[in-house]
Amino acid sequence: MSSEFLAELHWEDGFAIPVANEENKLLEDQLSKLKDERASLQDELREYEERINSMTSHFKNVKQELSITQSLCKARERETESEEHFKAIAQRELGRVKDEIQRLENEMASILEKKSDKENGIFKATQKLDGLKCQMNWDQQALEAWLEESAHKDSDALTLQKYAQQDDNKIRALTLQLERLTLECNQKRKILDNELTETISAQLELDKAAQDFRKIHNERQELIKQWENTIEQMQKRDGDIDNCALELARIKQETREKENLVKEKIKFLESEIGNNTEFEKRISVADRKLLKCRTAYQDHETSRIQLKGELDSLKATVNRTSSDLEALRKNISKIKKDIHEETARLQKTKNHNEIIQTKLKEITEKTMSVEEKATNLEDMLKEEEKDVKEVDVQLNLIKGVLFKKAQELQTETMKEKAVLSEIEGTRSSLKHLNHQLQKLDFETLKQQEIMYSQDFHIQQVERRMSRLKGEINSEEKQALEAKIVELRKSLEEKKSTCGLLETQIKKLHNDLYFIKKAHSKNSDEKQSLMTKINELNLFIDRSEKELDKAKGFKQDLMIEDNLLKLEVKRTREMLHSKAEEVLSLEKRKQQLYTAMEERTEEIKVHKTMLASQIRYVDQERENISTEFRERLSKIEKLKNRYEILTVVMLPPEGEEEKTQAYYVIKAAQEKEELQREGDCLDAKINKAEKEIYALENTLQVLNSCNNNYKQSFKKVTPSSDEYELKIQLEEQKRAVDEKYRYKQRQIRELQEDIQSMENTLDVIEHLANNVKEKLSEKQAYSFQLSKETEEQKPKLERVTKQCAKLTKEIRLLKDTKDETMEEQDIKLREMKQFHKVIDEMLVDIIEENTEIRIILQTYFQQSGLELPTASTKGSRQSSRSPSHTSLSARSSRSTSTSTSQSSIKVLELKFPASSSLVGSPSRPSSASSSSSNVKSKKSSK
């Protein structure tokens, strides 16, 4: 720096460099300090500016957040308002729906009443008609007899004819009226059905609207939640931004510090460059060491080979030790067996000895005398002792052998453990060595591969060189020619095989075409069967739904029953509470009487106590007055004594006389003390007087209470308040009794209602059980049908195949591709039979459920068809047996049935879910389902 400055000044080298004096040095120091302060102040200024910027950005974010929260609050308020609005709408709608339901119920009730009235009228009219018909028959007979008897009375005959005509007219009018009423009834039913459908549709619309509203509400909630989440995220981000701003300021500070460090590091770098040269030298030394390591590696490789040899020898030793161990185990097992045999033999000998002893005893007892017995026994004992000693010796020997063997076994087990541990160690070392071997083998293989590739490359280069030179061997030529011949032969063979394969492929294509056709037929059949199965499943589902409805109805009845029970319980509780109130009032009356008696006794006791207290207070007052008098007399005495003392206590001559002030002070002190005592006594007197006054007041109160109590025992006059209260209480009691009787009547009625409800519940349960039984029967029947359909599938396939073959043969014979007249005739008969079956089914349904007749009639009229009646059923039943066989034969032809079904006009019958249809099983709602059921029945037959 100084050299540059001197160069700018054109300072010559010969002259000495100028040095600043002390003042300039101080100025330079001050300047450097000021520069440092300036730099620090600039840094602080930058920091403050950055803080201001961050604060302004934070303020903006806060403002934005505030606006967002306000908007969110407004949205919440709007949501609450909308919810309240919707709630109010829903409540109004609910009220309207309730009114509508009530109106409909009233209308239903009125319609039912009208219906019952009409039915009664029809019944009466029919009864009258029957009576008139009977009269007509009787009148006709009488008329004929009378005409035979008197033919000459023409005028009477004319009158009779007139009456008969009048009767006929009446009958016709009644029949017309009956028909008109039935039509009106049908119309009313139609109107009722329409109303039902309208209500159901309105209900569905309402449900849909409610669902839509719920969806919208949920979406709105989700939006608000998303909004809240976004706000939270924004807040988090704002916090992150603030943190980042702080971090940025900190980083900037760090960068400044690091810049200073960098300057220092540059100098350090220059020094490190010098060090690097030294390290390069060291690296060269390390390379030399690496060469040495490689040589060492080769040495290790040789040692590895040696270790491998040692490992093999160790393996051999391990195998040898394992075989020795096995032999030892076998020996131990043999020794154990020998010991077991020896112990068994010893036991046998002991048993044998015992048997011999018993025998000896028996023999000696029988034959020998006492002395002989004794001598024999002694001999036997000696022999036995000898035997026992011998056995003991043998046992000791065996024990010694066993002990030795056990020790040997322990040593062998210890050896085995040691050998096993050695084996484990050798195994682990083996694994390690094997791993190293694998690594080395892998490296050698790599090296060999490289070698082979290099050799192959060299050979290829040599061949290319020879070819370039034009050198080809005769052997190579011959080999190439032989290869060409072989390739030609293989080409011809492949051509022939290719031709064969093409022919086979054509055949396979044909087979595939036929298989596809068969598969399509099978799929159609499968689809038809699946539709049948689906229809059966629908039937089962409907029956299950009806069962669920029955269960729901049962549950409603149970709920009503429980509600009634609750009402009964409530009434009982009310009754009990009223009874308890009556009892409590009576108890209260008795308690009042007892309390009055107790109170009188207490008042007497209190009187006596007060009298004694008054006496005690009078005595105290007399005592205090006596004390007061005594004290006054004492004061007089003290005064006299004082005068005497003053005379006595006059000082003798020569002594100083006590001053008058002394005696005045002393007297004042004594006076004050006396005054205090007097004040205390006055206070006590005042207190006693007050107590006396209070006692007098209590005495007056007691006297007034006693007077009232005495008056209460007097007879009550009609003009008094007590008499009026008594009358009121009696009236209340009468009202309570009447309520009690009314409640009892209500309870009886409720019990009767409960009984009737229980009876109806039993009936409903019985109906539900019947429905369940029917459902189980239907399920079993459906399962049977599905089984039968599965069984009929192969037959159907066979029949369809036969039919297809026959139709093909017939068409080939007639040289036509279109349908023949016979086929059309068969289809027509099938159609007729199908219609007959459907008609029979409809007639059966109408017979089972008379209410469905009107619905079916309306649907048939809409589609321009006539409803089948029961009169046609008989004729159809008579013709069913011959046509049944033809139908079962024709039902196997799936192709013809599928075409015939396509031409049928489908009637969609939608029945109302009324309670009258609970008992009857639900029918399929389309002609296709009924046809499938009929077919399945026919196939099962």
From Swiss-Prot:
The primary location reported for this protein is cytoplasm
Q: Which residues carry this modification: Phosphoserine?
A: S892, S900
Keyword annotations for this protein? Answer: Cell projection, Ciliopathy, Cilium, Coiled coil, Cytoplasm, Cytoskeleton, Kartagener syndrome, Phosphoprotein, Primary ciliary dyskinesia
User: What tissues is it present in?
Assistant: Mainly expressed in nasal brushings and, to a lesser extent, in lungs and testis.
Provide the GO biological process annotations.
axonemal dynein complex assembly; central nervous system myelination; cerebral cortex development; cerebrospinal fluid circulation; cilium movement; cilium-dependent cell motility; determination of digestive tract left/right asymmetry; determination of liver left/right asymmetry
Residues forming coiled coils: 16-122, 164-273, 306-605, 665-825
| Comp. bias (Low complexity) | 871-903, 914-934
Per the UniProt entry, the effect of T594I is: In CILD14; uncertain significance
Cellular compartments annotated: Cytoplasm, Cytoskeleton, Cilium axoneme
Disulfide connectivity for this sequence is none
State the associated disorder. Answer: Ciliary dyskinesia, primary, 14: A disorder characterized by abnormalities of motile cilia. Respiratory infections leading to chronic inflammation and bronchiectasis are recurrent, due to defects in the respiratory cilia; reduced fertility is often observed in male patients due to abnormalities of sperm tails. Half of the patients exhibit randomization of left-right body asymmetry and situs inversus, due to dysfunction of monocilia at the embryonic node. Primary ciliary dyskinesia associated with situs inversus is referred to as Kartagener syndrome.
Question: Which protein family is it in?
Answer: Belongs to the CCDC39 family.
Question: Protein name, please?
Answer: Coiled-coil domain-containing protein 39
- This protein's species is Homo sapiens
